[in-house]
UniProtKB/Swiss-Prot annotation:
Protein's organism: Human cytomegalovirus (strain Merlin)
Single GO cellular component term: host cell cytoplasm
Keywords noted in UniProt: Host cytoplasm, Host membrane, Membrane, Transmembrane, Transmembrane helix
Family recorded in the similarity comment: Belongs to the cytomegalovirus US12 family.
Location(s), subcellular: Host membrane; Host cytoplasm
Protein's UniProt name: Protein US16
Membrane-spanning ranges: 50-70, 85-105, 128-148, 154-174, 185-205, 210-230, 245-265
Membrane topology annotation: Multi-pass membrane protein
Amino acid sequence: MGLRFPTATQRQIVFRRLFDSGNNDDYDEAAVVAVLGWVHRFEVVVRIAGLLLFQISTAVAVLGSFSLVFPTATLKSRPGFPCHVVWAPEVLLLVPVASALFVYFRYERPVLAQRNRHPRCRRPFRQLVLLLAGLLAHIPALGVTCACQEPREVLTSFVLTLVITLLCAEVVFICRDNCTLSDQFALINGVWVVVFLANVLIVFTRPWTWPLRLLLGFYSTVGLIFAGHFSQQVLFVRHVLMPRDVAHTSLQLFITFISLFFLILRIRNCQDLLSDLRLLELPSSDAMTLTPNDLSHASSSTPLSTLSP
């Protein structure tokens, strides 16, 4: 259940019912107007707080991605890595504050002046462009995170599932006025099934070893789940930038980014797992010629029991 506020039309209906009952005292009228004003202010505050929470969670996810990709020794030796700015994390946390202020002065102030019709409703294509830009802005961080530590097959399967489900969400957003919410969710779930079957077909028809197939299938499936969940959240944000259930949506997205954080932590072991598999597949003659460094690396790597999710 989302935290929803009454629309301007609903407020007008309530306002008219109150005054059609015969009580037209100036005191009652002033009280109702004051209550509606405070409700609208509370709505604006909750919207800005939800947007700020969403942006902060994004910044935390990006910072966590950098801390997972790059070793701790590198971060300590170069305090401003990778931007060569000592206060890079603190500066990055100012981005959500600036974003929330921009949205408030650009989109919320007109609502205060024109409550009957929001200006963003008159330009749906422009708002669609803004939605796509907001989605694409988070993909480079994910791509950099995966590219710095993942094999090409894992990166490709993960990014493809993400892009396909985001495209599905964009199609649903365009057709939001022509079908019900249940039909939109059914469309997204149908795309999930198709992409999952295609992914299984690709993974199990390649000449790979079974451990590698299971590894790629596991990560691509988790990526598919994350991308599908994210596309559902995009569906919730049908009213672009300022959804009426923005508090619930921001909380869901925050949980999603936390899940992505642990997913990246899980993916980081991929190289160690593959190296362990290669060592196990070596013939006995090659195993006898292993150097002490190889043996120490094999003993310090992640055990094969971590393959199971």
